[in-house]
Amino acid sequence: LQHEYPNLFPSDDAKLVAGNTKEAGSYLWEMHNQNELELDFRPLSMSIMYHTPCHLRALDPNYNGLKLLQLIPGLNVLNADSGCSGMAGVYGLKRENNRTSLRVGWGLISTMQKTQAQIGSTECASCKLQMEQGVDKPTIPPIALLAYAYGRLPEVKAWIQTRHDSLVVP
């Protein structure tokens, strides 16, 4: 929306929408920096492995979903810091690209296999698929974890306890 919308629909309205569009985590972090974010989180006693998606690094080099999650008391947030997931949107879902996708994302996949963290977390649905390759740990969006810590989205508890079949031989 920020970059392509004004090109697709060249109008003042499109520019207005593009100029006021933010990724949810960036918006919440901005609120926190302005002391406008309520911090009445319930403690979450668990460890998570957080992955910053490539598109978020490109959109906002200063964005740090890791710091946003670290506001939740009791949550041990580990940084995957393993590079690209290799998915590139739907690229990695195509049969002819699957091997390349797995090779590119192997750093992240192996980090998830080795971690003691109970769950993974990322903003990107494509990265989520790759993070769940070869592990039985769920990957949950940061915004859902924040909502759960606020006492919302009670179904997150079931998501946290969900185990997946290993899709890739470890």
Give the positions of each predicted feature.
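Iron-sulfur cluster-binding electron-transfer modules in prokaryotic oxidoreductases
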Residues: L1-P170
